[in-house]
Amino acid sequence: MNFLLSWIHWGLAALLYFHNAKVLQAAPAQGDGDRQQGEVISFLTVYERSACRPVETMVDIFQEYPDEVEYIFKPSCVALMRCGGCCNDEALECVPTEVYNVTMEIMKLKPFQSQHIHPMSFQQHSKCECRPKKEVRIRQENHCEPCSERRKHLYKQDPLTCKCSCKFTDSRCKSKQLELNERTCRCEKPRR
């Protein structure tokens, strides 16, 4: 069902795209410099800009080189092309499928000791795609057997370990003047 809805969704988007192709050719490729304040941006433009694709992103150098804490970098961040945007499905994430390295000259300062311009390598993303999120892949790979054929509603299951445990807690049972039977996962009358 989700597959069919996805195809319909993309079909409508393609139809809108081709229908408004002339409008897009006239629109600026990046930025809103030519737009008037208060002007409404068309759905197709908004949709296209939100798609999963490489976008210029400011990246903190310490994020890329976390072990070089003894230095101060100038500039402290660099503009890199990185995957960004929406995948229109919460089970998917925008990830790079093609990358390359770029070398930039960065000033490395060691307080009260030295400073020099040093070539540093950074990864840029050239192609991006929507792919299943890691936790979704793990859950799909580790498909668990059900806890119990009978009385499934009484159990909860950890999707990572497949361990089954009682859905009800002892405190919940006690609030009803009952006791939790851990073998059956039911709240029962206390034995006397």
UniProtKB/Swiss-Prot annotation:
Task: List keywords of the entry alphabetically.
Answer: Angiogenesis, Developmental protein, Differentiation, Disulfide bond, Glycoprotein, Growth factor, Heparin-binding, Mitogen, Secreted, Signal
Annotated compartments = Secreted
Protein's name in the database: Vascular endothelial growth factor A
- Please give the chief subcellular localization of this protein: secreted
Q: Which GO terms describe its molecular function?
A: chemoattractant activity; growth factor activity; heparin binding; vascular endothelial growth factor receptor binding
Q: How does it assemble?
A: Homodimer; disulfide-linked. Also found as heterodimer with PGF Interacts with FLT1/VEGFR1 and KDR/VEGFR2 receptors, heparan sulfate and heparin.
Instruction: Write out the similarity annotation.
Output: Belongs to the PDGF/VEGF growth factor family.
Q: Which residues are glycosylated?
A: 101
**What's a BP term from Gene Ontology annotated to this protein?**
positive regulation of mast cell chemotaxis
Which pairs of Cys residues are joined through disulfide bonds in the record?
A: 52-94, 83-128, 87-130
InterPro entries on file: Cystine-knot_cytokine, PD_growth_factor_CS, PDGF/VEGF_dom, PDGF/VEGF_growth_factor, VEGF_C, VEGF_C_sf
Pfam families in the record: PDGF, VEGF_C
- Describe its function: Growth factor active in angiogenesis, vasculogenesis and endothelial cell growth. Induces endothelial cell proliferation, promotes cell migration, inhibits apoptosis and induces permeabilization of blood vessels.
What lineage is this protein's organism placed in? Eukaryota, Metazoa, Chordata, Craniata, Vertebrata
Task: Point out the signal peptide segment.
Answer: 1-26
Write down the PANTHER family for this protein, in alphabetical order.
VASCULAR ENDOTHELIAL GROWTH FACTOR, VASCULAR ENDOTHELIAL GROWTH FACTOR A, LONG FORM
- What tissues has this protein been observed in? Expressed by the venom gland, and probably other tissues.
Alphabetical GO CC annotations of the entry are: extracellular space; membrane
